[in-house]
C-alpha cells in the first residue's frame, strides 16, 4: 500500500502536513492505522439543509470500504488521491476525548445537535482497538441538553449501550443503523467489510 505523496512533508500544510507526519500505530493485511494529531473535533456544519449543527468524526477514512461512500474525497485533503486509500489508511484521533471535553461547553453548543459519524463509521474495526468513539461518548455523558445522533453500519454500537443510556438521561440521543439490503451477497459487494445485514438487524433489536 504505497502512499502517493508527490511533495515532501515540509511543503505540505494543514491536515495534509499532519497526515504526512502521522506515526503508524498498526499495519494489518488490508489497512494501516495511523495516529492523527488534531486541534479540534467539533466541526460546524455550514449547510442549513442538515438536521444538525455540529459533526464529530473519530477517524479519518473507513475500513468498511463501501463502494458508494460519498466521503472518499476527504482523503484528498491529506494528499491521498487513490480511491482505495480511504479504506487502507485509517487515521486515529487518539486525543479526541480530551479535546472534546474542552470544546463541549454550554455556551458554545446552546442545545444544538451533534452528528457522530458523518464522514466515517464511528464503529469501524479500528474502534474495537482504540475506543475513540467510546471515549467521546463518555465525555458527552457528562454534558446536558445535547442533541446527539449516531450513524453506523456496525453492531459494535451495542457495546456502548451503558453510555448511550447515560447520555439519554441528560440529553436527546438517536442511533441509526444503516441496512442497505438484506441480500448478504449484494451487501458484501457494496459494503465490502461491513457487518452482515443480520448482525445489524440484531443490533437494532438490542437497541
State the predicted function of each range.
Residues 24-59, 67-176, 180-188, 196-206:
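Conserved Radical SAM active-site core
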Amino acid at each position: 500500500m504505497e502512499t502517493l505523496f508527490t511533495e515532501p512533508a515540509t511543503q505540505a500544510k494543514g491536515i495534509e502536513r499532519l497526515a504526512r507526519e502521522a506515526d503508524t500505530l498498526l499495519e494489518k493485511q488490508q489497512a494501516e492505522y495511523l495516529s492523527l494529531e488534531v486541534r479540534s473535533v467539533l466541526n460546524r456544519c455550514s449547510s442549513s439543509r442538515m438536521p444538525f449543527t455540529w459533526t464529530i468524526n473519530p477517524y479519518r477514512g473507513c475500513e468498511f470500504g463501501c463502494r458508494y461512500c460519498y466521503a472518499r474525497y476527504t482523503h484528498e485533503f491529506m494528499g491521498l488521491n487513490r480511491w482505495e486509500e480511504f479504506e487502507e489508511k485509517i487515521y486515529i484521533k487518539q486525543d479526541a476525548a480530551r479535546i472534546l471535553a474542552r470544546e463541549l461547553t454550554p455556551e458554545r453548543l446552546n442545545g444544538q445537535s451533534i452528528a457522530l459519524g458523518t464522514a466515517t463509521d464511528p464503529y469501524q474495526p479500528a474502534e474495537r482497538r482504540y475506543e475513540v468513539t467510546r471515549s467521546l461518548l463518555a465525555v458527552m455523558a457528562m454534558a446536558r441538553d445535547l442533541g446527539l445522533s449516531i450513524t453506523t453500519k456496525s453492531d459494535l454500537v451495542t457495546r456502548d449501550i451503558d453510555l448511550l443510556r447515560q447520555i439519554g438521561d441528560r440529553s436527546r440521543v438517536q442511533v441509526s443503523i444503516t441496512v442497505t439490503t438484506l441480500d448478504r451477497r449484494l451487501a458484501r459487494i457494496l459494503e465490502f467489510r461491513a457487518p452482515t445485514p443480520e448482525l445489524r438487524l440484531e443490533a437494532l433489536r438490542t437497541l
